[in-house]
């Protein structure tokens, strides 16, 4: 009998800053003693936050899970641009800080459906080789614009130059009218976007629209589809965000600008130290496992269908799928995917074809 266990699991996992996504997978793989562990979207090494791990047979869900929308909190540092658009790159350009009014005016142009040119330092492949690897070898790459979607874009806070912003006005509750003509060193944004979106490219483009330049100094992924960072194994190991205290001594006034907090579990981490997951236990990971049930299917936008118990064995052995096997299927549009269940077990993923059904994946065997 097949049961959902660690060899077949979906695990929200909190990656720390300073650790690559691949290294995080390797540590979890060793900890669990399993060979197959994947994830649904790379996080840059400097970033922290939510990775959705797929363990064992559920790695076959990757094509579905990678399409889920994602949410981030990011600190955009103005006045400096690095070649990688993150803190790990070399400085290639400097400029004046933009006014807060120009930043606010630029944001509406980056919501909804937009064309975005990915950063040259990215995991996108050209001829089977990552663009970032080609650039580091001195090769030229031509990044083409891609259509992406931004569902929500909010300013959560900003850091103004005290030389232009009176100390008596600094702090929580400062009026936006007081800030508009003030030059800002950095802003913190909440972004909810489609798959394939690059926050580093957003920082580059917002700064350009403001007549400045920028890079992303801190980045945290707070949500993937219906999964929140607060549910993740190891979330307590992430650093807390203390940007106001840390930068008050650097000549910056730090304050909120009235935006309501987004539905996420924390702010941007300031630590870039890798804590690893050596002290993370199998028990913590198991406690974070997401049940693959009908509710899960609905939450990730899939149809759930139920197979009669007497046909489960035929399904698991890959026999041609027949409509009479199903107790229920819901709508049957061509191309629609569905998770298949029988007596509480998730058996696999199928797709409706014009002349029947086809297998996308079988997750377990008898």
Curated annotation (Swiss-Prot):
The keyword Isomerase applies. One of its GO terms (biological process) is tRNA pseudouridine synthesis. SUPFAM superfamilies: Pseudouridine synthase. Pfam families: TruB_C_2, TruB_N. Coiled coil: none annotated. Keywords: Isomerase, tRNA processing. Disulfide bonds: none annotated. It is an enzyme of class 5 (isomerase). It catalyses: uridine(55) in tRNA = pseudouridine(55) in tRNA. GO terms for molecular function: RNA binding; tRNA pseudouridine(55) synthase activity. The active site is at residue 44. The keyword Lipid biosynthesis does not apply. NCBIfam families: TruB (TIGR00431). Responsible for synthesis of pseudouridine from uracil-55 in the psi GC loop of transfer RNAs. This is tRNA pseudouridine synthase B. It comes from Treponema pallidum (strain Nichols).
